[in-house]
């Protein structure tokens, strides 16, 4: 598969260091460090790739628009030109973009509308696991979820994520429960831990990690009202 990887953020030397670390040597992978869209199309016409990857769309600019790369007008015009190229050539194009603090795709909404599929790759700074979610899929279901582990030699698929979530044996301990949950079409076994103690100060402290605090307070209110639990003076 002839792949053209367009890097607008990293130099060829940086990409070479990463390829050496991963022991990756593919003669069909072509690297182009360029941000000028017209030059990218020229090189693509010479290479004739089967797949093009652009990293990232916020760094690409076109001469048609007189504004800086990453602006709304530049992202909109570059995306439209890339869409036209993909349709005329039949070459799939993978656009890599940034997300804002709210978790949405940075830039104009038209970028999300013109593409066929939107995949969000997210991770946790404390763990080596990465989650790939399908936000939009014009030709399939969005109820898909992929879990990967970042290792020294690259990403590797996690075939049994429940085994990672249940790393310890807490049999016989109070306050620990294991339940089955579904994310998309994939079942998971997750572990929930709860700790209740008498409040030392006047106002009980309620905190949650990995769970919505407002939802937890609602569940506590249901337990208090309907199940007879006395949780008013409990942390």
What do the PLM-derived regions correspond to, one by one?
Residues 1-81, 225, 233-235:
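Conserved inter-motif catalytic segment of the P-loop NTP-binding fold
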Residues 5-9, 34, 50, 68, ...:
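Conserved phosphate/pyrophosphate-binding and hydrolysis machinery centered on Walker-type P-loop NTPases
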Residues 9-13, 21-24, 35-39, 57-60, ...:
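Conserved nucleotide-binding/hydrolysis micro-motifs of P-loop NTPases
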Residues 15, 55, 97, 115, ...:
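Residue-level signature of catalytic and energy-coupling elements of molecular machines
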Residues 45-52, 58, 123-213:
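Conserved P-loop NTPase
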Residues 73-94, 98, 114-125, 224:
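Substrate-engagement module of ASCE P-loop NTPases
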Residues 203-235:
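Terminal-proximal interaction/regulatory segments of ATP-powered molecular machines
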């Amino acid at each position: 598969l002839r792949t053209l990887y367009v890097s607008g953020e990293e130099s060829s030397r940086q990409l070479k260091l990463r390829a050496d670390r991963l022991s990756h040597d593919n003669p069909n992978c072509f690297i182009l460090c360029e941000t000028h869209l017209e030059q990218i199309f020229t090189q693509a016409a010479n290479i004739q790739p089967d797949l093009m990857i652009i990293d990232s769309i916020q760094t690409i600019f076109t001469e048609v628009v007189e504004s800086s790369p990453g602006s709304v007008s530049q992202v909109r015009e570059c995306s439209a030109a890339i869409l036209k190229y993909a349709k005329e050539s039949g070459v799939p194009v993978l656009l890599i973009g940034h997300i804002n603090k709210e978790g949405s795709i940075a830039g104009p909404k038209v970028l999300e509308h013109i593409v066929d599929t939107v995949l969000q790759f997210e991770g946790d700074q404390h763990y080596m696991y990465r989650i790939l979610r399908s936000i939009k899929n014009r030709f399939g279901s969005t109820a898909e979820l992929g879990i990967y582990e970042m290792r020294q030699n690259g990403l590797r698929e996690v075939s049994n994520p429940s085994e990672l979530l249940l790393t310890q044996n807490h049999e016989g301990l109070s306050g620990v429960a294991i339940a089955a949950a579904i994310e998309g079409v994939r079942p998971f076994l997750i572990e929930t831990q709860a700790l209740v103690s008498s409040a030392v100060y006047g106002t009980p402290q309620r905190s949650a990690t990995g769970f919505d605090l407002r939802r937890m307070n609602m569940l506590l209110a249901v337990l208090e009202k309907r199940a007879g639990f006395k949780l008013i003076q409990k942390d």
